[in-house]
Amino acid sequence: MGRECEITGKKTMFGNNVPRKGLSRKKGGGGQHIGVKTRRTFKVNLINKKFFVPELGKSINIKVSASTLRSISKLGLSVFLKKNSKKIEDFI
């Protein structure tokens, strides 16, 4: 799958670096001057995590993003998978 969260499907995004200089007009300046845009990538913060599944009585390894991991710790793995319409059997 590459750099992709196995539960939510988050993956690398692409965008621009936009350098800005000068004080904004709102703050009393002459306006911001935008330089040349440079392409860049926004990579997902992925973590390989081992989760224990009490229903199966064993552990499973899942590659998840950090934001997904926070949600799993709040809700629990089975509730979060159900919310994202995934099944535990998909990760075995």
From Swiss-Prot:
Keywords: Ribonucleoprotein, Ribosomal protein. The keyword Transferase does not apply. Gene3D superfamilies: Ribosomal protein L28/L24 (2.30.170.40). InterPro entries: Ribosomal_bL28, Ribosomal_bL28/bL31-like_sf, Ribosomal_bL28_bact-type, Ribosomal_bL28_sf. Transmembrane segments: none annotated. One of its GO terms (cellular component) is ribosome. One of its GO terms (biological process) is translation. Residues 1-34 are annotated as: Disordered. One of its GO terms (molecular function) is structural constituent of ribosome. Belongs to the bacterial ribosomal protein bL28 family. This is Large ribosomal subunit protein bL28. It comes from Borrelia turicatae (strain 91E135). The lineage of its organism: Bacteria, Pseudomonadati, Spirochaetota, Spirochaetia, Spirochaetales.
